[in-house]
Amino acid sequence: MAVARTGVLGVQWLQRASWNMMPLGARTASHMTKDMFPGPYPRTPEERAAAAKKYNMRVEDYEPYPDDGMGYGDYPKLPDRSQHERDPWYSWDQPDLRLNWGEPMHWHLDMFNRNRVDTSPIPVSWNVMCMQLFGFLAFMIFMCWVGEVYPVYQPVGPKQYPYNNLYLERGGDPSKEPERVVHYEI
């Protein structure tokens, strides 16, 4: 415990001592450049063409988010499709996100990446899935009801006891000879 405490104190001292001499690498590399921020909303066709060129898009395909004060600026409005729908066999520059270098990312990429929402079409429609689910549940409830109404037990024979069918233990007269009981073996 003391060694761990000493190590933590040593690292903290080193960070405080070296703070004025050199900045942390993660801090200097994590800032966003002015090119990464969306520009103002394009009002003229020239501004629209410049914004399309900025995002590596054709002017016909470029459509910005509406200027409703949410701060989207000139960022392109891309279709709401998840990364699952993109070709998994294509040679992407970033295969985990299925993106190429310079390609604009969706504004809500954190929602549409591959471990979140999947917007790809489902092979079976919702009404068919619901019919299958509720049909299975109804069948199982029906079978449970049938099992309650008509119980099934293993067939058994009459109970057999040793020592002349426990004649004395079951209140038999000790002065009389009990009747002979034949036990059958199965």
UniProtKB/Swiss-Prot annotation:
The chain crosses the membrane at residues 133-153. It is a single-pass membrane protein. GO terms for biological process: mitochondrial electron transport, NADH to ubiquinone. It comes from the Eukaryota. Pfam families: NDUF_B8 (PF05821). Residues 1-28 form a transit peptide. It is found in: Mitochondrion inner membrane. The keyword Transferase does not apply. InterPro entries: NDUFB8, Ndufb8_metazoa. GO terms for cellular component: mitochondrial inner membrane; respiratory chain complex I. Keywords: Electron transport, Membrane, Mitochondrion, Mitochondrion inner membrane, Respiratory chain, Transit peptide, Transmembrane, Transmembrane helix, Transport. Belongs to the complex I NDUFB8 subunit family. Complex I is composed of 45 different subunits. Accessory subunit of the mitochondrial membrane respiratory chain NADH dehydrogenase (Complex I), that is believed not to be involved in catalysis. Complex I functions in the transfer of electrons from NADH to the respiratory chain. The immediate electron acceptor for the enzyme is believed to be ubiquinone. This is NADH dehydrogenase [ubiquinone] 1 beta subcomplex subunit 8, mitochondrial. The lineage of its organism: Eukaryota, Metazoa, Chordata, Craniata, Vertebrata.
